[in-house]
A protein has these predicted regions:
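Glycine- and acidic-residue-biased ligand/ion/polar-headgroup-sensing regions
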Residues: 60-72, 77
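Short beta-strand His + acidic residue motifs that chelate non-heme Fe in jelly-roll/DSBH
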Residues: 53-55, 74-75, 91, 97-103
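Double-stranded beta-helix
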Residues: 2-6, 10, 98-125
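Conserved short histidine dyad/triad with adjacent acidic residue
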Residues: 41-59
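A generic "binding-loop/recognition-motif" signal
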Residues: 49, 60, 79, 95-96, ...
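Short acidic-glycine-tyrosine-enriched beta hairpin
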Residues: 78-93
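A short, N-terminal "cap"/entry segment at the start of jelly-roll beta-barrel domains
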Residues: 1-40, 54-55, 121-125
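Short strand-coil-strand connectors
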Residues: 36-38, 75-79, 102
């Protein structure tokens, strides 16, 4: 296989979204990384003013978030962390977390290693 064919057969670097435009969504996942063959999961989460993501234990993965707009609080097992635009927060694997949006809502970019997906296989025998 020549170099051109090899390049055509694999994913190539490219712009996949605009965090500022995506963060304009009202609530929920405003954007997510779509290519099927990827090693990362990434999305922009939008919470309206006063909304929250209830306390839960995170996945068996490191998660990095970058606050885009608004403000809020991240509650952990031991602390409450103020979230402001530009803030970068590391969430260790299985750490407890609760996100609470401030008066102007909260929008953040989240990225982590891709979670293993479920696959449906034929039953043998």
């Amino acid at each position: 296989m020549d170099a051109d064919a090899a390049a055509a057969a694999r994913e190539m670097p490219r712009i996949v979204g605009d965090a500022l435009t995506a963060s304009a969504a009202e609530a929920g996942s405003a954007w997510r990384l779509e290519p099927a063959e990827r090693g990362l999961d990434a999305n922009v989460i939008a919470l309206p003013a006063g909304d929250e993501i209830r306390t839960h234990t995170g996945p068996e993965l490191d998660v990095l978030i970058v606050v885009l707009t608004g403000s809020g609080t991240l509650e952990t097992e031991t602390d409450a962390i103020a979230l402001e635009p530009g803030g970068i927060v590391w969430l260790p694997p299985r750490s407890q977390r609760r996100f609470i949006a401030g008066e102007k809502g909260l929008r953040y970019f989240s990225v982590h290693q891709r979670k293993p997906g479920l696959s449906i296989r034929s039953r043998v025998g």
